Amino acid sequence: METQRASLCLGRWSLWLLLLGLVVPSASAQALSYREAVLRAVDRLNEQSSEANLYRLLELDQPPKADEDPGTPKPVSFTVKETVCPRPTRQPPELCDFKENGRVKQCVGTVTLNPSIHSLDISCNEIQSVRRRPRPPYLPRPRPPPFFPPRLPPRIPPGFPPRFPPRFPGKR
């Protein structure tokens, strides 16, 4: 009787383990998060790039409003920056430091959150970096020359005799 009860209990446990085994793979195939999908897009960008160094996620814009269907393409917008890691090393970009004065690219496109659908449509454009000219050392501004109003001839009051005598003294 004890052995029948033990085998029945063992049968139930094996049934539970079987059901759990069926549920776990479906849980692992859950939808990716927005960030994970963008990181996957950055990996694809690094794979397809012909540049010398890897790029790493610098900034991730806000995710769009929640959509229930993970198979629907979601709009993404993010910024990547060049790292010090050479592309052939195949090192994860997250472990690489950003390159000083490295290239920065703004990327936009769509990704799907379903890991079984590899739908990525991303395009990246390099952001023109604004290189600042070094400031010259502080020098005081030269002062403008003082303002002197123009000199006007003295005003002659009316009725004042003319300054020069007439050419012909007898004629007026």
Curated annotation (Swiss-Prot):
GN (gene name): PR39
UniProt-recorded name of the protein: Antibacterial protein PR-39
Role of this protein: Exerts a potent antimicrobial activity against both E.coli and B.megaterium.
GO molecular function: lipopolysaccharide binding
Organism of derivation: Sus scrofa
Pro residues bias locations: 136-172
Subcellular location, record wording: Secreted
Keywords per UniProt: Amidation, Antibiotic, Antimicrobial, Disulfide bond, Pyrrolidone carboxylic acid, Secreted, Signal
GO biological process: antimicrobial humoral immune response mediated by antimicrobial peptide; defense response to Gram-negative bacterium; defense response to Gram-positive bacterium; innate immune response
Pfam family, one: Cathelicidins
Propeptide residues according to the Swiss-Prot or TrEMBL record: 30-130
Family label: Belongs to the cathelicidin family.
